Amino acid sequence: MTAMKEDNAALITLKKNNDQEKLRVHKLTDASSNSADGFVINKAKNGGPLNKKSLVNNEQHIKKAVSPGRVRKHKTTTSSTKSRTKSKKKDASESKVQRENKGSFYQGAIFGSFLGAAVTTVLSNLAVKALQN
């Protein structure tokens, strides 16, 4: 039983050593790929640009590409007042007449509906009496 534990422990340490060696090799290859002709290329951790100014420009560019927002059309210039016909101002009496007409229309519609209901009830009562006789 103890022999199996020792074997397992030996396997685990071998795996750890192999993993560490792989990591060392990987780090060495990354370092060599970052340098070219003696110049070292600096990479940001997040993959973004190093400048704050270019970062702002980059964010604006991305924002425009993703959602341009509402596109507003340019308003056409209005013609001069001389060529336009001036609207006449309405008298106060004319506006009151229009309001009265509008109100009387609604009042007439309400009155007409009640009148129609009364007529139908009277006619239905007459028809019932005629059928009973």
Swiss-Prot record:
Changing residue 121 to A: In pmr3-6; leads to mislocalization. Its main location: nucleus. Changing residue 114 to S: In pmr3-3; leads to mislocalization and decreases nuclear fusion efficiency. The keyword Membrane applies. It is a single-pass membrane protein. It is found in: Nucleus outer membrane; Cytoplasm, Cytoskeleton, Microtubule organizing center, Spindle pole body. A motif (Bipartite nuclear localization signal) lies at residues 69-75. Residues 36-100 are annotated as: Disordered. GO terms for biological process: karyogamy involved in conjugation with cellular fusion; nuclear membrane fusion involved in karyogamy. Keywords: Cytoplasm, Cytoskeleton, Membrane, Nucleus, Transmembrane, Transmembrane helix. The keyword Transmembrane applies. This is Pheromone-regulated membrane protein 3. It comes from Saccharomyces cerevisiae (strain ATCC 204508 / S288c) (Baker's yeast). The gene is PRM3.
